[in-house]
Every structure is written in C-alpha cells, then in structure tokens.
Regions:
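Short acidic/histidine-rich active-site segments
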Residues: 266-288, 293-310, 353-354
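Acidic, glycine-enriched loop/beta-strand segments at the rims
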Residues: 8-19, 266-267, 324-332, 341-373
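Divalent metal-dependent hydrolysis catalytic cores, especially in the metallo-beta-lactamase
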Residues: 60, 75-104, 120-133, 160-172, ...
Length: 373
C-alpha cells in the first residue's frame, strides 16, 4: 500500500512531499519520489494528516475485555485497539492474589510471544499492584497489597520478570530503595503511584532509578504551597515522565495545563487508564472484581471512587488540542512518541522505516478518519 498526498508527522513536523509504503504491518519505505510497485494499491490522502499509531502505557480493559480475564481477553483487546489506532499497549493489572497475578503475567507473555497481524502489539505488562500504599488505594483492593521485595516480585511473575515492562509502586514503603534499584538494573521501568510519598521521597526515588509517575495527581499526595507532594516532584524533576488522564473527569483542566507547561512535549504521557466500559454505553460494569457504574463518561465504584476511565486514545489526542490548548505537533508526541520513550519501546510512536502499523488518518481540524495499515 502506497500513501501519497498527505501530511505525514515525521521528526516532529508535518511533511507533505512524502510517500510512505506500508506492508506486512510495518512501514517498509519512505521517500519523496516513491513509485508504486506492480499491482500495489495507491491511496490519495487528499491532504489528510497521517500520524503514528498510539501507544497506551496504562490500560486495564476495553469493550468488555479485561486484562485480568487472561489471554483471550487480552488478544481481543489487541484486535479492537488496533482499529482505534493503537499500535502498542501495556495490559495493566489490578491488585489480586499471587496466583491470579501469576496467571495473568503468563497470559501476557503468551500474547507478547505470538503477536497477530492487525492487532496492537503487547509490549509487556504494566503491573499497577501490589506494592502500593493503603492510604492511596483508589480502586485497587487493599487486601492484596504487599511491601516491595524482589522475592515477592519473582513469585508474582512466576520468575518471568521480563514480561513486566512497567511496575507502579509507592516509594515510601519499606525496602523500596532496594526494589527500585534492582528493577532498574533489570530494565523494568518503575512508575511512582498510589502513594503517600512526600515531594522529597519522589525525588529520592528518581535518584534510585524510578523514571515515571502513574496518573499524576490521582491516588497520590496532593500539591500544596508548603508540601508539594507527588505532583510537585513529578512536575519539576526532569528525570520523570508524567502520565495523566486527560478525560475532563479525573483532572481539572487547569491541572492538566500546569502539567503540560511543566513537562512540555518531551515528558508528558497521555494514557487512558480505561476499564471495560471504554467503547461501550453507560451501564454496570466491573474492574478488578469490583462493581463499577458508568454514567456520562465517569466510571465509579459504589462509594464514588473513580475506577479508571472510558477514554480512547484518539479522544485523548483531540482533547489535548481542543481542551488543553496544545499544538498538533505537541499533542502527537504526547500520545505516541512520549509513551513509547517512557517504556523504552523502539519502533513505536514514530513514522519511520520499520515502524509498526497502524498509522492514523485525520481530516480537517483533526477529525478522525480511521486507520491505515
């Protein structure tokens, strides 16, 4: 498939004098003067924008399929997310028993090792539990929380630590330093979240090797003028990528704008943190074995606690421009390149030879037109 006459986002700019060839799920060639191969389909994009596929580093579920359900659900998530323009994602776990966690990590490994065509790539697990603070549990179940230890991590993963790409943890817990250092040594990205840490403890965790903050502002100590908490460190420490849920529900618009001004187009990471109702109508659903009610784009436990989102990555991208005042160039990076960089995923989040499909197509004013590839 040869793509012509579009505005392709390459190297942080939109380029119009470019042709891009897609084949077998990847970009296979790029040049200004590419001629079609014999029998090759040629698509005239008529000036539409073409962006890299999205990378979602924090997503629990989609359209009724939940990571914690296992392999079949994760594969179906991958197929359906591809159609929404997602090139890669991290199936994200909830706090659960050791046996259930081990089962899900094994399922994620099987999907990683046997990817399907026309399905988003699973790049590993985002373990959002169990090394969390009971004070900031959010929708995670406290009865499964543990203090961090490498031995517990080996048990939870069945020894397959490389199936885990990111682990969220509270850095103020006992033995956190030893765990963070060991995880970083083994190429696992430590994300600070569900934590009652102080500003100083977050900076210290970055010194130990933490590189990310999980859904900044949510389920963590708040920012105040004398105790800036987790957000204070997240927004000022250049070593840290900062996830955020830009759905207009989890965060006040100005809180997102502050994050974007502080982290810029280099370190802000859009996520969905979506649960199984994403892409489905309002109603009664579940997250981590807990009942969730979805009404008007809000997913809440029965006690009113927010329980993930119903956000799509393409909506997160559009919100960055329409709601939070970002340029198209910045919005693209925050939804593609930055998430990929924050988890060390080469070959994703950019348009280049070897990059994975799908690409996404957008019309005037960035109206969604679907996927390419």
């Amino acid at each position: 498939m040869l793509l012509r006459n579009g505005l392709f986002f390459v190297d942080d700019h939109f380029w119009e004098k470019l042709c891009v060839r897609l084949g077998t799920g990847r970009v296979t060639a790029m040049d200004e003067g590419l001629a079609p191969l014999a029998g090759e389909a040629v698509i005239d994009l008529q000036g539409d924008f073409v962006l890299p596929g999205f990378v979602d580093a924090h997503i629990h579920a989609f359209r009724g399929h939940d990571t914690m359900q296992g392999e079949d659900a994760i594969r179906q998530m991958a197929r359906e997310l591809y159609q929404e323009g997602v090139a890669a994602f991290l199936p994200t776990t909830m706090s659960a028993s050791v046996e259930d966690t081990r089962r899900v990590i094994a399922a994620i490994r099987r999907v990683m090792d046997t990817p399907e065509q026309r399905a988003a790539r699973v790049l590993g697990a985002h373990m959002e539990a169990p090394f969390l603070s009971p004070e900031k549990a959010g929708a995670q179940r406290k009865e499964f929380f543990l203090h961090p230890s490498w031995e517990a991590f080996l048990d939870l993963t069945g020894g397959d630590i490389q199936a885990v790409r990111v682990i969220t943890m509270a850095p103020e817990l006992p033995s956190a330093e030893a765990f963070i250092r060991k995880a970083a040594e083994n190429g696992i990205h430590v994300s600070i979240g569900h934590t009652a840490a102080t500003d100083e403890q977050v900076h210290q965790a970055a010194e130990w090797g933490a590189t990310r903050v999980t859904h900044t502002y949510n389920a963590q100590t708040p920012f105040t003028h004398r105790a800036p908490g987790v957000p204070g460190a997240a927004l000022t420490d250049d070593r840290l990528f900062a996830e955020f849920i830009g759905d207009g529900v989890h965060l006040h618009d100005d809180a997102v704008k502050v994050l974007l001004r502080c982290k810029g187009a280099d370190k802000a990471v859009a996520i969905t943190d979506s649960m199984e109702a994403a892409g489905l109508p309002d109603g009664e659903y579940a997250l981590g074995g807990q009942a969730v009610t979805v009404r008007g784009h809000e997913a809440r436990l029965h006690d009113g606690t927010l329980a993930g989102s119903v956000l799509l990555m393409r909506q997160a991208f559009q919100n960055l421009m329409a709601r939070y005042g970002q340029t198209p160039e910045a919005a693209v990076r925050i939804c593609t390149e930055n998430p990929a960089r924050s988890i060390g995923a080469s070959g994703f989040g950019t348009i280049c030879v070897g990059a994975n499909a799908p690409l996404t197509r957008w019309g005037k004013d960035f109206a969604w037109k679907g996927i390419l590839g």
